[in-house]
UniProtKB/Swiss-Prot annotation:
E.C. designation(s): 2.1.1.45
PROSITE patterns (alphabetical): THYMIDYLATE_SYNTHASE
Residues at which dUMP binds: 22, 180-183, 191, 221-223
Protein species of origin: Haemophilus influenzae (strain PittGG)
Record protein name field: Thymidylate synthase
Length: 283
C-alpha cells in the first residue's frame, strides 16, 4: 500500500495537466512509476484505503488468458469491465469491423492467444511460455504482448497494460509487466491485482516458485473529475495491513485455467478496508 499511496501523492503534488483527446478530459500526469509486488511472501497488493473489488480484476485477466473477445464472456466470468468499451465507445461503434453488441474486437487476450502471422496462421504466445517454463527453459524471450499496432483498428481499445515478461532464475519465476497508461484511481486498483495473480498462477501451473513481480508504468494519471476524491478523501485515510491471496491448489495446468476455473477458486484472507469511493470512469 505504501508505494501505491506514494504514487498517488506524487501525482497530486508533482503532476502536470495534460489534455486527453479520447475522453475530452484533462489528466494530472507524471511519467514513469515502478511498483514491486512480493508474490513469494503472498503480500497481496489489494488497496485498503477504499474497498477494492478484487474478483472482477482476476475475472478480467482470466478472460485474457482464455482469449475472450466478447464482453458477454467477461460478464459470465464475473466482471462488467468491458461493457462500456465494447458498447459505448463512439469510435468503436462507428468502426466497420465491429461485429455487434458486446464485440471487443482483436484486443488483449486475442493477441496473446492468436496473434496473426502474414500467412494467416496464428501464434499462441501464452502456450509457448507455459511450455518453456514447465521444462525449466527461459530463452530470455518469454514475452506475452497484447500490443499489435497492425490491428489497432480491429479492436475497441489499445491495451494499457500491454506486455508481460517472465524470467526464470533457478526454480524461481519472476514477472515484469509494462503499462503504457494508467488511470491510477481506477485502473491501478485492477492492474496490480492482475500482475500479482498472473505471476502466482503461472508459477503454480509450471511447477515453479513465485518470486517478485515488477510493474512498470509510463503515463500515470488522475482524471480531473477524480482529483478531489483522491486528494481530499482517499489520501486522508490510513492503510490497513495487506491481505493474502489463496488459489485453489487443484489448478495445475493452462487447460484448467481455460476450462473449469471460476472465481470460487480464489479467496482473499485478512482483508480490511475503508468505505468504497465511487470514482468516475472515462470511456
Amino acid at each position: 500500500m505504501k508505494q501505491y499511496l506514494e504514487l498517488c501523492r506524487r501525482i497530486v503534488s508533482e503532476g502536470e495537466w495534460v489534455a486527453n483527446e479520447r475522453t475530452g478530459k484533462r489528466c494530472l500526469t507524471v511519467i514513469n512509476a515502478d511498483l514491486e509486488y512480493d508474490v513469494a511472501n503472498n503480500q497481496f497488493p489489494l488497496i485498503t484505503t477504499r474497498k477494492s473489488y478484487w474478483k472482477a480484476a482476476i475475472a478480467e485477466f482470466l478472460g485474457y488468458i482464455r482469449g475472450y473477445d466478447n464482453a458477454a464472456d467477461f460478464r459470465e466470468l464475473g466482471t462488467k469491465t468491458w461493457d462500456a468499451n465494447a458498447n459505448e465507445n463512439a469510435a468503436w461503434l462507428a468502426n466497420p469491423h465491429r461485429r455487434g453488441v458486446d464485440d471487443m474486437g482483436r484486443v488483449y487476450g486475442v493477441q496473446g492467444r492468436a496473434w496473426r502471422k502474414p500467412n494467416g496462421e496464428t501464434i499462441d504466445q501464452l502456450r509457448k511460455i507455459v511450455n518453456n517454463l514447465t521444462k525449466g527453459i527461459d530463452d530470455r524471450g518469454e514475452i506475452l504482448t497484447f500490443f499489435n499496432p497492425g490491428e489497432f483498428d480491429l479492436g475497441c481499445l489499445r491495451p494499457c497494460m500491454h506486455t508481460h515478461t517472465f524470467s526464470l532464475v533457478g526454480d524461481t519465476l519472476h514477472l515484469t509487466s509494462y503499462q503504457r497508461s494508467c488511470d491510477v484511481p481506477l485502473g491501478l486498483n485492477f492492474n496490480q491485482i492482475q500482475v500479482f495473480t498472473f505471476l502466482a498462477l503461472m508459477a503454480q501451473i509450471t511447477g515453479k516458485k513465485a518470486g517478485k513481480a515488477y510493474h512498470k508504468i509510463v503515463n500515470a494519471h488522475i482524471y480531473e473529475d477524480q482529483l478531489e476524491l483522491m486528494r481530499d478523501v482517499q489520501l486522508k485515510r490510513e492503510p490497513f495491513p495487506l491481505p493474502k491471496l489463496e488459489i485453489n491448489p487443484d489448478i495445475k495446468t493452462l487447460e484448467d485455467l481455460e476450462t473449469w476455473v471460476t472465481m470460487d477458486d480464489f479467496k482473499v484472507v485478512g482483508y480490511q478496508s475503508h468505505e468504497p469511493i465511487k470514482y468516475p470512469f472515462s470511456v
